[in-house]
């Protein structure tokens, strides 16, 4: 069951993101929380693989729950933004909502921000200047500061990457 759920989630995420050059990010998030964080809960790892399906694809919560169960769906909902809102509102709400997320969702959020900050440092979008990259690091740090403290190794890695990013952007 453990491996089946994770493999099924990988396949589902790949299918849902098939029109996007994107599947590497969800895999990176799941790998980060498993490898660095020592997380082996199949529902958390499956949710990490699926964490952007509600935001970035046509997936509905009912579909996730039917395929992967209530807990996986709850984790994904907990880390998903409401894409109907303007970007600034979504960013502000993500900072505020981080205080209320479950421990499982906090693990996924840490893995997500580690992956995203690493990309912003090493492979930023072409149209992001240094100020935009610094703003992203500041925002990501606020989100993680508000998350429940759940895993020292992931939290330390996030802080190391933020520090590396700030040094690189001087």
PLM features: residue spans?
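Active-site helical microenvironments for divalent-metal-assisted chemistry
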Residues: 1-170
